């Protein structure tokens, strides 16, 4: 058995940010592809995003609530919340793309569907969601 002290908050390691080349469309002055930084969010933050993506109405059953979950919106909000570089909440950056929110900016900065999908998948991996999560998302979509 482990000593309970090993589980105390001050012993808890913080997840390391992940660097990821989300797209080849942005390069530095030497032509090197810029890497984006992804940082995991907390379970509480994830719950807030999930709630924002569910359209609950009074009288809905649990099954109806599950069916009202907007997976696409969830993926966009999760990816935007976990992206720490570039800063998707930067007003100047948003203005340059003509958008007003981080989720829309992310879609504009990753205009190729494959790049966007791979980025969302990398964000999910960074947050600890494995293959089962991806399968669950597909099940909800269908």
Which ranges hold each PLM region?
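Low-complexity, charged, repeat-rich alpha-helical/coil interaction segments
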Residues: 1, 25-26, 30
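Low-complexity intrinsically disordered segments
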Residues: 1-15, 132-142
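Short acidic, Pro/Gly- and aromatic-enriched capping/linker segments at domain boundaries
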Residues: 11-26
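Short, surface-exposed, charged amphipathic helix/loop patches that serve as local interaction elements
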Residues: 30-142
């Amino acid at each position: 058995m482990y000593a309970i002290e090993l589980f105390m908050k001050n012993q808890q390691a913080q997840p390391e940010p992940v660097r990821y080349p989300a797209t080849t469309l942005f390069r530095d002055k030497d032509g090197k592809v810029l890497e984006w930084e992804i940082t995991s969010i907390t379970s509480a933050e994830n719950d807030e995003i999930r709630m924002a993506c569910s359209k609950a109405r009074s009288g809905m059953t649990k099954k109806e609530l599950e069916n009202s979950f907007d997976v696409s919106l969830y993926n966009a909000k999760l990816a935007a919340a976990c992206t720490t570089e570039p800063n998707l909440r930067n007003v100047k950056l948003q203005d340059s793309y003509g958008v007003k929110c981080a989720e829309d900016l992310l879609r504009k900065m990753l205009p190729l569907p494959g790049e966007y999908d791979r980025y969302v998948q990398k964000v999910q991996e960074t947050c600890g969601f494995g293959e089962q999560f991806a399968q669950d998302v597909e099940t909800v979509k269908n």
